[in-house]
């Protein structure tokens, strides 16, 4: 049983395309603690040990407010939540540390450990988060609120003793 030259060419081209597509796929972290939620990241070219004085500080900011949020990093921004006064804010920074925008997304919790605790979840150009007082919010990468709902009000529920932290 023989294959024609055209069939061989199409088969080899298809296999090479599949192989290069699979191996060229960019690493994307779409879950908490990385792919598979293991906390293990397969990056290469990382330092084997830290310099004695530690890594150099690229930038810092005190403009986000107070809280316990982790950052969410995308290709073009760094997002973090923080409490300012009685409200929770989502702040977007450029990769060089300049504030792009800051958007109020709900009232902060007044319960124990009252500062912001919500780490933004990023998916397809939108950020999802929840305020300390139960406001579930979707914010675009332009800082505009797409939708918001307070689930304590919607479901006639009371706030938990220690507020909300997802």
Feature locations, PLM:
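Bacterial N-terminal signal peptides that target proteins for export
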Residues: 1-12
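Short, intrinsically disordered, low-complexity terminal segments
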Residues: 2, 21-23
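Bacterial N-terminal signal peptides
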Residues: 11-21
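Noncatalytic, solvent-exposed loop/strand surfaces
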Residues: 25-166
């Amino acid at each position: 049983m023989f294959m024609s030259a055209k069939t061989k060419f199409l088969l080899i081209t298809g296999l090479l395309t599949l192989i290069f597509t699979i191996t060229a796929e960019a690493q994307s972290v779409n879950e908490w603690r990385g792919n598979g939620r293991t906390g293990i990241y397969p990056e290469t070219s990382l330092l084997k040990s830290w310099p004695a004085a530690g890594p150099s500080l690229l930038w810092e900011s005190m403009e986000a407010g107070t809280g316990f949020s982790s950052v969410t990093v995308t290709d073009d921004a760094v997002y973090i939540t923080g409490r300012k006064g009685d409200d929770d804010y989502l702040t977007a920074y450029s990769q060089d540390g300049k504030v792009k925008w800051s958007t109020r997304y709900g009232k902060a919790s007044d319960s124990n450990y009252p500062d912001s605790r919500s780490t933004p979840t990023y998916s397809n150009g939108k950020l999802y988060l929840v305020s300390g007082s139960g406001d579930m919010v979707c914010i675009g990468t332009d800082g505009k609120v797409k939708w918001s709902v307070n689930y304590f009000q919607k479901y006639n529920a009371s706030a938990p003793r220690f507020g909300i932290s997802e």
